[in-house]
From Swiss-Prot:
Keywords tagged on the record: Acetylation, Secreted, Virulence
Encoding gene per record: PE25
GO biological process, alphabetically ordered: protein heterotrimerization
Organism in which the protein naturally occurs: Mycobacterium tuberculosis (strain ATCC 25618 / H37Rv)
Major site of localization recorded for this protein: secreted
Domain of life: Bacteria
Family: Belongs to the mycobacterial PE family.
Function according to Swiss-Prot or TrEMBL: The PE25/PPE41 dimer induces both a strong humoral and cellular immune response. PE25 protein alone induces low response. The dimer induces necrosis, but not apoptosis, in mouse macrophage cells. It also induces activation and maturation of mouse dendritic cells and drives Th2-biased immune responses.
Name of the protein in question: PE-PGRS family protein PE25
Record localization: Secreted
Length: 99
């Protein structure tokens, strides 16, 4: 038989920390977005234009990656919170059963 030992409060703290990390990533992305998505060619030649286009596209993909990571982090935080609630409920039910 398998046993699981967990601390619901620790799971709740972890969920809060994951959300803080997500919020910080979103905030950092928002701060740099104007600079990274508005790269202008340093000269009026084809190479400069291609380089600027490449950098803007790279920044766009970065922003998409951050947005996807934020979704994953929120889902993970939600799973931690849900797990903490379920473990806390199970513990409360066990206490009632044996009281």
């Amino acid at each position: 038989m398998s046993f699981v030992i967990t601390n619901p409060e620790a799971l709740t703290v972890a969920a809060t920390e994951v959300r803080r990390i997500r919020d910080r990533a979103i905030q950092s992305d928002a701060q740099v977005a104007p600079m990274t998505t508005a790269v202008r060619p340093p000269a009026a030649d084809l190479v400069s234009e291609k380089a600027a286009t490449f950098l803007v596209e790279y920044a766009r993909k970065y922003r998409q990656t951050i947005a996807a990571a934020a979704v994953v982090l929120e889902e993970f935080a939600h799973a931690l919170t849900t797990g903490a609630d379920k473990y806390a409920t199970a513990e409360a039910d066990n206490i009632k059963t044996f009281s």
